[in-house]
Curated annotation (Swiss-Prot):
CDD domains: AAA. It comes from the Bacteria. The gene is ruvB. Belongs to the RuvB family. Keywords: ATP-binding, Cytoplasm, DNA damage, DNA recombination, DNA repair, DNA-binding, Hydrolase, Nucleotide-binding. Residues 4-190 are annotated as: Large ATPase domain (RuvB-L). This is Holliday junction branch migration complex subunit RuvB. The lineage of its organism: Bacteria, Pseudomonadati, Pseudomonadota, Betaproteobacteria, Burkholderiales. Disulfide bonds: none annotated. It comes from Burkholderia cepacia (Pseudomonas cepacia).
Length: 355
């Protein structure tokens, strides 16, 4: 898993932050209020109403669970919620909270109506999660003082607060934890027009000269993810500074992204390597995950966690009971003719999941 995480971070089209330096860069571009937040109209509209209602009643906002693929703005929304409520935000992550005392220290230092943001909340340990339940429901925690026979439980009252939890894997949350969130919102991938607006906004903040077609070219290759769009913008800006007097047009963006091996649909070398292996080494599939991993020289976890999700989501790859199968889109993308529906190759190529 460590190798998988490292590999994901090294890809320019990875949706996870590549480094602490990139996280600093992201914060500089982060919108500060809902009016500036592009996309996710349904979620944004709901939050506008819930936040305004809580402010009118002088109450903390109900606990919020944000889930969806990485890089779509969950952390940004947590910061916006705190700013719109006019309160402080304390930020941590599930893996950091190793002991119950870690969480207790955070909770007891919150002021009235503050926001506590826990990223990767699905990775909370069971011990820490148990402490969280009464805190969410009754604004109280039970902590143990002392050891052995002298140990005793002490109940501490907390200030009312809002928990904002973020996760890329909502299915890994326990039911008791999930049920304690009054507001649950799924963040979806962005379309090219929305990403183009984000690119233009980020370019303005970076004092980069970009025209609408240049922004759209970057957006179309950003895999529906603002984090990737901003990362590609930085690299295209570098290219434009050296090769095009700082002007980012569609042609300049295309040349820069071609140099980075990011093709018109956002695939990089690893994506193409996987799909071409299925097409050429296994006649379009089906092929088992272990055979595919051996064929391209990657770990099974890397394929399942890093490469496949976007390819499946975009309809270029299909999982069937017999293995991975290339779809019509894959053949078209590589300029190949798909096998006839009645051929041996085409019978599984056209089989839906679960058949």
């Amino acid at each position: 898993m460590i190798e998988t995480d490292k590999l994901a971070a090294e890809r320019i089209i990875a949706a996870t932050p590549a480094s602490s330096h990139e996280e600093v860069f992201e914060r500089a571009l982060r919108p500060r209020q809902l009016d500036d937040y592009v996309g996710q109209e349904k979620v944004r509209g709901q939050l506008e109403i819930f936040i305004e209602a809580a402010k009118r009643r002088s109450e903390p906002l109900d606990h919020v669970l944000l889930f969806g693929p990485p890089g779509l703005g969950k952390t940004t929304l947590a910061h916006i919620i705190a700013r719109e409520m006019g309160v402080n935000l304390r930020q941590t992550s599930g893996p950091v909270l190793e002991r119950a005392g870690d969480l207790a220290a955070l909770l007891t230092n919150l002021e009235a109506n503050d926001v506590l943001f826990i990223d990767e909340i699905h990775r909370l340990s069971p011990v820490v999660e148990e402490i969280l339940y009464p805190a969410l429901e009754d604004y109280q925690i039970d902590i143990m003082i002392g050891e052995g026979p002298a140990a005793r439980s002490v109940k501490l009252d907390l200030q009312p607060f809002t928990l904002v939890g973020a996760t890329t894997r909502a299915g890994m949350l326990t039911n008791p934890l999930r049920d304690r969130f009054g507001i649950v919102a799924r963040l979806e991938f962005y379309d090219a027009e929305q990403l183009s607006r984000i690119v233009r906004r980020s370019a303005a903040l970076l004092n980069a000269q970009i025209d609408p077609n240049g922004a759209l070219e970057i957006a179309k290759r950003s895999r529906g993810t603002p984090r990737i769009a901003n990362r590609l913008l930085r690299r295209v800006r570098d290219y434009a500074e050296v090769k095009a007097d700082g002007q980012i047009t569609a042609a300049v963006a295309d040349a820069a992204l071609a140099m980075l091996d990011v093709d018109p649909v956002g695939f990089d070398l690893m994506d193409r390597k996987l799909l071409e292996a299925i097409l050429h080494k296994f006649d379009g599939g089906p092929v088992g995950i272990d055979n595919l991993a051996a064929a391209i020289g990657e770990e099974r976890d890397t394929i399942e966690d890093v490469l496949e999700p976007y390819l499946i989501q975009q309809g270029f790859l299909q999982r069937t009971p017999r293995g991975r199968v290339a779809t019509l889109l894959t053949y078209r993308h590589f300029g190949l003719s798909a096998p006839a529906a009645g051929s041996a190759e085409g019978s599984m190529w056209n089989t839906p999941d679960g058949a």
